């Protein structure tokens, strides 16, 4: 290949393709492949400079708060429910757990978090297909314009982009932009102040996100009434035959554990994660039984407990590794708010069992606009194109913070602007209300207890919305919800649902109109039109006669790409297959060629250390690129095919078992979820592509109650006029009767709900709800309870967020070493820690919060040092 680059003939042909005149002594490789790019120096790569930037932009920096120091405890004493696990050979539950029930100290914070800041992949020759593409381009005597476009697009991506984790400057800029969305031109608004109630929002979500009962793969779930350790159920004898029923959500064990275990993974602290969650829920339960939330000492004990657990609301702010533009490398970096693992676990226990068991969307439910669990393959995209081509309009689809509208034969792709920043705690309260009343409900009876209802409605929203985060050693405010928390999807989907509800009430104006844009101000939800395609039906129909010979049109390798319509439908475009007679998906061209230029690496990080995994990853990467659309582009297809074959030969020559590597091939690819249930040897052929795109009947829906086939428009109008009826309202009343912290007549409200429950007639098919309550009465009760729940949420949030004033807090931070050059990147804020007692101290009279019956361990050297320092400072003030 080096001979090709150094030949004069090659220079002439390549230069002609790009309109570049030959230059004496200049190598073609220098023209097409840029030199190694060195990212610019990050101007905010120290805590003091970062703090100054945030202060200058009015961003709230919080007073540093202390963490309890971790101490070692016997696992069998902390988690007696899981004592059996320690007897199983191969089980990894540690004999001791490092728990935070010792004296309190300020945490030491890792300045650098993986992936490393400032590092970027620049022309990754081990994976990049550029040279192979250029080589293949040289073999074409008369290059067509489409082939030239392929080379141009790929080389432009290599020149203009880089894969990496951006900069602290980019992270800080993103934080300020999130604050502007939340508090700027259209500040966030609580839905209850706009006339919504939790029940009316739930009735909208019944249409846009119908859910079923909790479960996994047809396995029924246990009620939400237990602590996490009791969600692992042993059946049988550990010394003989046994099984373990696992009712905990799936988690990524390689991801960050978060506070209070900075620098460790969830897999390394899984025992601690369960232990902290257990203790939190048990303390909450004990206080609720004592009437916590009412005025008096019990209320103070609850707030004291929440203050002890403040770190559950403080995420670690990581940069998201992406393919960023080099021109905006300093200012554009996406953030990931990594929740503390106990917070992630407890919220996931509410959302994951329901959402993972709800494959309900536009493909299998009439009138449902949801794209949740939508797969563009197996005829999925063709169904959407048929929906677009149908003459009825306006109409809409929705997925998280993405809205798609067909209006006046124009396709609109609309995104919520900085989607997570638009979310308020009340929005998440409404989302939790929906999951509990529609998912965790058995024929109207709740499958949850008071503790879980109180946590979901009154505590969880304050843990992840408008909470706080750590970046470097700064504790700062988070505006909106933390990106990547266990409720991110449903919160964003709820926001988009409210936008569509207002659009329906306005009689569905054109998205280009000022009337449509006025929804932003009314709801306090910002959005923008990302893409619009006029004459969408005409453009889609033109794909049929223009389809070129290829894998799915004649069964041959393509010599010219077929045209596409870039719908931006969750990143997918449409093209046409003559063989199948349907529209099939290809990844949007820009995204496809950017992915070809810069790989993300092995998706499952636990496989990274496996010998031979790099070559196996190459096989998967190149074949996956072909599957998601590379098959339609001749040069990219050939380059990926040749590179995958070379990687296969390398594995075979080294004696690595190829089949073993590729058995779980979807875990190696960033596109893995797309191919769920598709089993091939990972060699792209005409037959495999046809099988992947062959239409199959959609999965049957799994819902707890029938979905209104009249669609969202009918429900929006019925709610406005008060004509809507919903038999699921009973579980909502039970929830609102139990999940409150301050309602003085809670007993009376609960009795009312039980009275309604007993009024249900014997006939299971009878419309008992119609007979017992009118909509107006229900909404009136829900409105009262919603306001009470909101009041409780404010107090909960105040306990979790230790900000002493409403003004921007501007403490002086000591200058520390630059994290790019520091030999020891671990630093702490050397300030005296403030000691805080927990609920058990209030109950027992002494000591910090630790498991009941456990003796206080001996203080560590660090704790002794901090205590002596505090004593000296106290004496000096006297």
Swiss-Prot record:
Coiled-coil annotated spans: none
Q: Which domain of life is it from?
A: Viruses
Provide the reaction this enzyme catalyses: RNA(n) + a ribonucleoside 5'-triphosphate = RNA(n+1) + diphosphate
Q: Which UniProt keywords apply?
A: Covalent protein-RNA linkage, GTP-binding, Nucleotide-binding, Nucleotidyltransferase, Phosphoprotein, RNA-directed RNA polymerase, Transferase, Viral RNA replication, Virion
One Pfam family in the UniProt entry: Birna_RdRp_C
The Gene Ontology CC terms held by the record are: virion component
Residue ranges for the region (Disordered) are 845-878
**Could you provide one GO biological process annotation from this protein's UniProt record?**
viral genome replication
Q: Where is each RdRp catalytic domain found?
A: 397-597
- Major location (coarse): virion
Where would you find this protein in the cell? Virion
The enzyme's main class, written as a single word, is transferase
Q: Where does GTP bind?
A: 258-265
Q: How is it modified after translation?
A: May exist in multiple phosphorylated forms.
GO molecular function: any one? Answer: GTP binding
Its function? RNA-dependent RNA polymerase which is found both free and covalently attached to the genomic RNA. May also contain guanylyl and methyl transferase activities.
In its UniProt entry, what is this protein called? RNA-directed RNA polymerase
Name of encoding gene: VP1
């Amino acid at each position: 290949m080096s001979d090709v680059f150094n030949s004069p003939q090659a220079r002439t042909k390549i230069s002609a393709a790009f309109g570049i005149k030959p230059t004496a002594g200049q190598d073609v490789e220098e023209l097409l492949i840029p030199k190694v790019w060195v990212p610019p120096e990050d101007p905010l790569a120290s805590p003091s400079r970062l703090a100054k930037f945030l202060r200058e932009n009015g961003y709230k920096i919080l007073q540093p708060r202390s963490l309890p120091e971790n101490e070692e405890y016997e696992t069998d004493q902390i988690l007696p429910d899981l004592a059996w696990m320690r007897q199983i050979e191969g089980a990894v539950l540690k004999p001791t757990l490092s728990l935070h029930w010792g004296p309190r100290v300020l945490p030491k914070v890792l300045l650098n978090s993986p992936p490393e800041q400032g590092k970027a992949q620049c022309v990754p020759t081990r994976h990049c297909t550029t040279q192979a593409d250029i080589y293949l381009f040289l073999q074409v005597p008369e290059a067509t314009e489409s082939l030239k476009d392929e080379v141009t697009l790929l080389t432009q991506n290599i020149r203009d982009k880089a894969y990496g984790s951006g900069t602290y400057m980019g992270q800080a800029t993103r934080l300020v932009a999130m604050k502007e969305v939340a508090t700027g031109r259209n500040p966030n608004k609580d839905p209850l102040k706009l006339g919504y109630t939790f029940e009316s929002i739930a009735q909208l979500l019944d249409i846009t996100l119908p859910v079923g009962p909790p479960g996994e793969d047809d396995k029924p779930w246990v009620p939400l009434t237990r602590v996490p350790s009791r969600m692992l159920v042993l059946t049988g004898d550990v010394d003989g035959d046994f099984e373990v029923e696992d009712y905990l959500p799936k988690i990524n064990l390689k991801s960050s554990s978060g506070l209070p275990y900075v620098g460790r993974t969830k897999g390394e602290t899984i025992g601690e994660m369960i232990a902290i969650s257990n203790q939190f829920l048990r303390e909450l339960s004990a206080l609720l039984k004592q009437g916590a939330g009412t005025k008096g000492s019990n209320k103070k004990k609850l707030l004291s407990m929440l203050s002890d657990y403040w770190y559950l609301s403080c995420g670690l702010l990581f940069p998201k590794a992406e393919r960023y533009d080099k021109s905006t490398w300093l200012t554009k970096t996406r953030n990931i708010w990594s929740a503390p693992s106990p917070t992630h676990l407890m919220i996931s226990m509410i959302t994951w069992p329901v959402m993972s068991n709800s494959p309900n969307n536009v493909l299998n439910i009439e009138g449902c606009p949801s794209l949740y669990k939508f797969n563009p393959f197996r005829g999925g995209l063709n169904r959407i194109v048929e929906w677009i081509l149908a003459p009825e309009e306006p109409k809409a689809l929705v997925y998280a913070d993405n809205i798609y509208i067909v209006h006046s034969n124009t396709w609109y792709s609309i995104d919520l602007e900085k989607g997570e920043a638009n979310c308020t705690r009340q929005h998440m309260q409404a989302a939790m209300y929906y999951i509990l009343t529609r998912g965790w409900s058995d024929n109207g009876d709740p499958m949850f207890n008071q503790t879980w209802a109180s946590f979901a409605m009154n505590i969880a929203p304050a843990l992840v919305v408008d909470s706080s985060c750590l970046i470097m050693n700064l504790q700062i405010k988070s505006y909106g919800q933390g990106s990547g928390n266990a409720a991110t999807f449903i919160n964003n989907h709820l926001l988009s649902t409210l936008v569509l509800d207002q659009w329906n009430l306005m009689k569905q104006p054109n998205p280009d109109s000022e009337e449509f844009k006025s929804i932003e101000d009314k709801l306090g939800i910002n959005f923008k039109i990302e893409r619009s395609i006029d004459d969408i039906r005409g453009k889609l129909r033109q794909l049929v006669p223009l389809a070129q010979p290829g894998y799915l049109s004649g069964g041959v390798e393509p010599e010219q790409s077929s045209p596409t319509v870039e719908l931006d439908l969750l990143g997918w475009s449409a093209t046409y297959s003559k063989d199948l007679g349907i529209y099939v998906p290809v990844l949007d061209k820009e995204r496809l060629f950017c992915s070809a230029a810069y790989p993300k690496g092995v998706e499952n990080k636990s496989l990274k250390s496996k010998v031979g995994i790099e070559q196996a990853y190459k096989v998967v990467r190149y074949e996956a690129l072909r599957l998601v659309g590379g098959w339609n582009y001749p040069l990219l297809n050939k380059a990926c095919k040749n590179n995958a074959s070379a990687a296969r030969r390398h594995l075979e020559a080294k004696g690595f078992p190829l089949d073993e590597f590729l058995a779980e091939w979807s875990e190696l690819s960033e596109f893995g979820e797309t191919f769920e249930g598709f089993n091939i040897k990972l060699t792209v052929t005409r037959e495999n592509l046809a099988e992947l795109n062959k239409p199959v009947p959609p999965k049957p829906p799994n819902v707890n109650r029938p979905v209104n086939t009249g669609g969202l428009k009918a429900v929006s109008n019925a709610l406005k006029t008060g004509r809507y009826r919903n038999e699921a309202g009973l579980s909502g009343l039970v929830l609102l009767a139990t999940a409150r912290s301050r309602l003085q007549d809670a007993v009376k409200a609960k009795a009312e709900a039980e009275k309604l429950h007993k009024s249900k007639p014997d006939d299971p098919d009878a419309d008992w709800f119609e007979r017992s309550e009118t909509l107006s009465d229900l909404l009136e009760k829900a409105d009262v309870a919603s306001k009470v729940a909101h009041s409780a949420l404010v107090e909960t949030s105040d306990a979790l967020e230790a900000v002493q004033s409403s003004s921007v807090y501007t403490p002086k931070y000591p200058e520390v070493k630059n994290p790019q050059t520091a030999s020891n990147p671990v630093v702490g804020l050397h300030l005296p820690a403030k000691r805080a007692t927990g609920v058990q101290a209030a109950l027992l009279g002494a000591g910090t919060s630790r498991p009941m019956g456990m003796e206080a361990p001996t203080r560590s050297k660090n704790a002794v040092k901090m205590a002596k320092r505090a004593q000296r400072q106290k004496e000096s003030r006297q």
